[in-house]
Swiss-Prot record:
Any one GO cellular component localisation term in the record: plasma membrane
Keywords on record: Cell membrane, Cytoplasm, Golgi apparatus, Ion transport, Membrane, Nucleus, Transmembrane, Transmembrane helix, Transport, Zinc, Zinc transport
Family classification: Belongs to the ZIP transporter (TC 2.A.5) family.
Source species: Mus musculus
UniProt note on tissues of expression: Highly expressed in the testes and portions of the digestive system including the stomach, ileum and cecum. In contrast, expressed at very low levels in liver, duodenum, jejunum, and colon.
Protein's cellular compartments: Cell membrane; Nucleus; Cytoplasm; Golgi apparatus
Protein name in the entry: Zinc transporter ZIP11
Length: 342
């Protein structure tokens, strides 16, 4: 993120930084055990606050200013921002709905690696070997918008998206040690599971990469769309990606993957961001009138991910107060970066 280069190069540098932060978070799998849930919940809460602040000061505020200064909307200057914001949220929501049709719910071992439900584990029966696959302290993680664990209500009843039922565990899951050979390598059908995992993570990271690319593509289009603002957005997304890398690698390690393989797939979750960032920068450079829509689209996608995934995940394991105060701290830190250094 160096001044004096084109917006596309800036976007590439910015998203390489966010990818590096994902890898740094995933590398913590070499240090932390899979039972240290408080650390992850606090980090996720902090990331949620950072992303909410970045969505407004680095994306929505420039979008509103561009729509207002264009003069083409008059009293309806809010319209392109509202449309873009709604479309961004809808993009993540629809991508989430498509995951079951791509086979993400058909293989229980995929869910087992990423969804270790504390409620199910607390009710484990010592007489049932399938209930003792993982200790109660094991992590229960979702991967962004397409994650495998989500406490929500549908028609008044709590359900968990893409949840592994107890019958799935009994019928289709072997103990974690049998998933891999003695060298920690995945079994014969694991490459399909890995492909589904990468697909889920990729869908989640596209909006973040787009946000960085659009942010750099919008530089100097309005007074609030500055290089500093785009740089701060990349820093904020990098901060958010740090616990995300850990949220991928730690459950995989607990599910029986070797430490190096857990790290590899954890850092892989950020690989799509440079591609999405370059695409976003190219799009706004070539079609400047779409800038308000593009900025608001990125903001809507990120806010939806925060509200639908990061905040519920941070609250689900009994560390809600810690996560909430960490969110406040993250918001203040990102606001200070944008206002003080923007």
């Amino acid at each position: 993120m160096l001044q004096g280069y084109s917006s596309v190069v800036q976007a590439l540098l910015g998203t390489f930084f966010t990818w590096a932060m994902t890898a740094a978070g995933a590398a913590l799998v070499f240090i932390f055990s899979s039972g240290q849930r408080r650390i992850l919940d606090g980090s996720l809460g902090f990331a949620a606050g950072v992303m909410l602040a970045a969505s407004y000061w680095s994306l929505l505020a420039p979008a509103v200013e561009m729509a207002t200064s264009s003069g083409g909307f008059g009293a309806f200057a809010f319209f392109p921002v509202a449309v873009g914001f709604t479309l961004g949220a809808a993009f993540v929501y629809l991508a989430d709905l498509l995951m079951p049709h791509l086979g993400a719910t058909e293989d229980p071992q995929t869910a087992l690696a990423l969804n270790l439900d504390p409620a199910l584990m607390k009710k484990s029966d010592p007489r049932d070997p399938t209930s003792l696959l993982f200790p109660e302290s094991e992590l229960s993680i979702r991967i962004g918008s397409t994650g495998l664990l989500s406490d929500k209500r549908e028609n008044g009843e709590v359900y968990q998206r893409k949840k592994v039922a107890a019958t799935d565990l009994a019928e289709g899951v072997a103990p974690s040690g049998s998933m891999h050979g003695s060298s920690g390598q995945p079994g014969g059908s694991s490459w399909r599971r890995i492909a589904l995992l990468i697909l889920a993570i990729t869908i989640h990271n596209i909006p973040e990469g787009l946000a960085v690319g659009v942010g750099f593509g919008a530089v100097e289009k309005t007074a609030s769309a500055t290089f500093e603002s785009a740089r701060n957005l990349a820093i904020g997304i990098g901060i958010q990606n740090f616990p995300e890398g850990l949220a991928v690698s730690l459950p995989l390690r607990g599910a029986g993957f070797s430490t190096w393989k857990a790290f590899w797939y954890g850092q892989l979750s950020g690989m799509v961001e440079p591609l999405a960032g370059v695409f976003g920068a190219f799009a706004v450079v070539l079609a400047e009138p779409i800038l308000p829509y593009a900025l608001a689209f990125a903001a809507g996608a990120m806010v939806y991910v925060v509200m639908d995934d990061i905040i519920p995940e941070a609250q689900i394991s009994g560390n809600g107060k810690l996560a909430s105060w960490a969110s406040i701290l993250g918001f203040v830190v990102m606001m200070s970066l944008d206002v003080g250094l923007g």
